[in-house]
Amino acid sequence: MGKNGRLRWNPFSHRSSSSTSSSSRQQQQEQQPPVEFLCPISKSVMSDPVVVSSGQTFERVCVQVCRDLNFIPKLNDDEESLPDFSNIIPNLNMKSTIDTWCDTVGVSRPQPPDYSTVERILRQQMPPPDVEIRVSEQELLRAVAHRAPMIIHHADSELMGRRDFNNSTTSSDESVIVAHSPFTPLPLTTRPACFSPSPSSSSSEIETLTHHTFFSNSTSTATEEDEVIYNKLKSSEIFDQEQGLIMMRKMTRTNDEARVSLCSPRILSLLKNMIVSRYSLVQTNALASLVNLSLDKKNKLTIVRLGFVPILIDVLKSGSREAQEHAAGTIFSLSLEDDNKMPIGVLGALQPLLHALRAAESDRTRHDSALALYHLTLNQTNRSKLVRLGAVPALFSMVRSGESASRALLVICNLACCSEGRSAMLDANAVAILVGKLREEWTEEPTEARSSSSARENCVAALFALSHESLRFKGLAKEARAVEVLKEVEERGTERAREKAKKILQLMRERVPEDDEEDGEGSIDWDRVIDSNGSIRSRFRVGGRNRVVTQNSSGF
């Protein structure tokens, strides 16, 4: 108060109050947990986070309650985001991050939610008892059933044309077939190399039963044989288990009805235990039966959801040679289903498949591992994950050495569709390696023309992908003397290879400004240059000194 008894205004007192409130709000915001720390069901910070088969992370208690209630909650009112609780893996990285955050902000670490509380939350989301609305596994299977003919047609044609491969020894390159289409290379193979429609000479399969013993009369006979197999599989006698598995293996080799009827939860639960059996004959026949069951589209989702993938990964890592063949074949067969691609990648199959492709003793294991990786990397998440696992240097090492080069090129073409893959490839000297491989392919003997054609197409497709969205490509291509090789491909290659080579050469001539003529005559119709299928969509306007270049590329 001043001399005159009047109050004086102090501006600093107001500023201090405002600063204090702002600091308080900032502190409150810092204590708000990140959204990824919250369980989508309980909406609270997770104390024991687990990753489910569909890739999401939940509180363990919430997953258990959902299983007990046989209920699949919707996430954000999105039908496509329905979680899959068939298998869980502890998310240790998330748990460690949450604990660190709690210690940093000075709050207590989260405790598991009460079971009854979670149950009450979920029951509020469940429809009334009199309303028959529930998303079940069978409904999910029916929802994708209409897509089956696309795969079945390829399977039928491929099996008829390549049946000899399953019963004879072929070169590694001959076993990889690429579709003759302008799209991304797609192997027509839909049957694992370990699968044979006729009785095999495998030591694990005893030829004591004729090929047409079962399902020859009626559906009632099928039911009777199902019961016989079930009773043998659940027997405590190893001999009975072996006989039951041999019967099952033979029944499911060619009979579609047998594959569907025997892919039941009670038989699959017994089969899962036998895959980890210490008796090699039991394990191998169980895996062979699973391969046969997985050939039916309806069974692919069921097998993954019942938790077979982690077991197959373990067998692929440390099983016998024949067991590894069947494990790789099953994973390949399961990966043909789009809804299985992400769960298989999340469950950790990519690294073991890559190792099997490089180092497996069996050619069949390497073959099916390559095709499994090819189909899994059609998924963007798996592509990025495989790049982070260091797959690019390993794959190009195989191309350079010539070991399973065509198989490695299939995966490389998919990885080139993502920016991480292209960057890693350029760092791994991919342009020089691919150009060198193209040079080698022109010197192959005529007997190897089929494999050379496939390898050339994949090399050119990979170079075509690298030529986009990369300022480094042109310099690297010139250094590798790619122009002369690409001109050779343009003149003598297959139709698909010629088209790609022509586009790469045009991109190299016209893409960089310093290569333009000073007077700039006319313009180029780039819509005619780029793929008619739209897999690479780029538009350029070239004219005069001022050239406008706009690009919107989405892979190849």
Curated annotation (Swiss-Prot):
Its EC number is 2.3.2.27. ARM repeats lie at residues 256-295, 297-336, 338-378, 380-417, 418-468. Coiled coil: none annotated. Residues 1-34 are annotated as: Disordered. It catalyses: S-ubiquitinyl-[E2 ubiquitin-conjugating enzyme]-L-cysteine + [acceptor protein]-L-lysine = [E2 ubiquitin-conjugating enzyme]-L-cysteine + N(6)-ubiquitinyl-[acceptor protein]-L-lysine. The keyword Membrane does not apply. Pfam families: Arm, U-box. PROSITE patterns: U_BOX. The keyword Repeat applies. Gene3D superfamilies: Leucine-rich Repeat Variant, Zinc/RING finger domain, C3HC4 (zinc finger). GO terms for biological process: protein ubiquitination. Pathway: Protein modification; protein ubiquitination. It comes from the Eukaryota. Residues 32-108 form the U-box domain. Residues 13-32 have a biased composition (Low complexity). Keywords: Repeat, Transferase, Ubl conjugation pathway. GO terms for molecular function: transmembrane receptor protein serine/threonine kinase binding; ubiquitin-protein transferase activity. PANTHER family: U BOX DOMAIN-CONTAINING (PTHR23315), U-BOX DOMAIN-CONTAINING PROTEIN 38 (PTHR23315:SF276). Binds to SD16, SD17, SD18 and SD129. Functions as an E3 ubiquitin ligase. This is U-box domain-containing protein 38.
